[in-house]
């Protein structure tokens, strides 16, 4: 068994606080503990196009309250996932469209892990799921977990 976080592998996990994303983080934590991979829990901050912002662009003045809420949600998801204590978990907030941001974040990494369905709601069902987009476009292997 590899030492915690010393294998050089990074497992990227998409986390939005939904049950499937927490299940994905839990699985990734066990995988990271078993392989020595670092687990990077990623929360994507997405501004809908209706907000009048260019896709994938963060406004110059970031709303600190919203960013703090994102950090709290990510921290809560890590707590709910109850990852193996020997797993090396890091957290990150990125900005952009969820599927594209996760694909970008996982580029050059060992594995991308996502839940089968997140908080995308009806619009996600119409446009295709983030999980399917990741499976079809990520450069690394993708694990999709049901929660």
Each model region followed by its residue ranges:
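Short glycine/serine/threonine/alanine-rich loop segments
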Residues: 35-38, 87, 140
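General small-molecule cofactor/ligand-binding pocket signal
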Residues: 40-42, 90-94, 143
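Gly/Ser-rich helix-loop-strand patches that form or flank binding pockets
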Residues: 105-147
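A short acidic, glycine-rich active-site loop
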Residues: 58-72
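Structural beta-alpha unit
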Residues: 1-7, 20, 79-112
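Short beta->alpha linker loops
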Residues: 69, 93-97, 117
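Small/aliphatic-rich secondary-structure junction motif
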Residues: 2-57
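Short, hinge-like loop/turn segments at secondary-structure boundaries
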Residues: 56-60, 109-110
């Amino acid at each position: 068994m590899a030492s915690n976080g010393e294998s050089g592998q990074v497992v990227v996990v998409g986390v939005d606080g939904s049950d499937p994303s927490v299940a994905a983080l839990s699985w990734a934590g066990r995988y990271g503990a078993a392989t020595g991979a670092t687990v990077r829990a990623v929360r994507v901050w997405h501004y809908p196009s209706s907000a009048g912002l260019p896709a994938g662009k963060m406004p110059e003045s970031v709303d600190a309250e919203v960013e703090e809420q994102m950090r709290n949600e990510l921290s809560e998801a890590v707590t709910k996932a109850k990852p193996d204590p020997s797993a090396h978990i890091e957290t990150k907030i990125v900005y952009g469209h969820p599927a594209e941001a996760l694909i970008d974040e996982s580029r050059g990494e060992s594995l991308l892990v996502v839940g089968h369905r997140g908080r995308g709601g009806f619009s996600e069902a119409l446009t295709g799921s983030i999980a399917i987009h990741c499976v079809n476009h990520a450069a690394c292997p993708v694990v999709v977990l049901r929660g």
